[in-house]
Amino acid sequence: GCCGSFACRFGCVPCCV
């Protein structure tokens, strides 16, 4: 999943919003 990934946690992609 994307949530919890480096990109998501550091705001590189809007997958956790």
From Swiss-Prot:
The keyword Protein transport does not apply. Intracranial injection into mice causes circular motion, barrel rolling and convulsions. Transmembrane segments: none annotated. It comes from the Eukaryota. Disulfide bonds join C2-C16, C3-C12, C8-C15. Expressed by the venom duct. The keyword Disulfide bond applies. The cysteine framework is III (CC-C-C-CC). Belongs to the conotoxin M superfamily. It is found in: Secreted. The modification 4-hydroxyproline is found at P14. It comes from Conus marmoreus (Marble cone). One of its GO terms (cellular component) is extracellular region. One of its GO terms (molecular function) is toxin activity. This is Conotoxin mr3a.
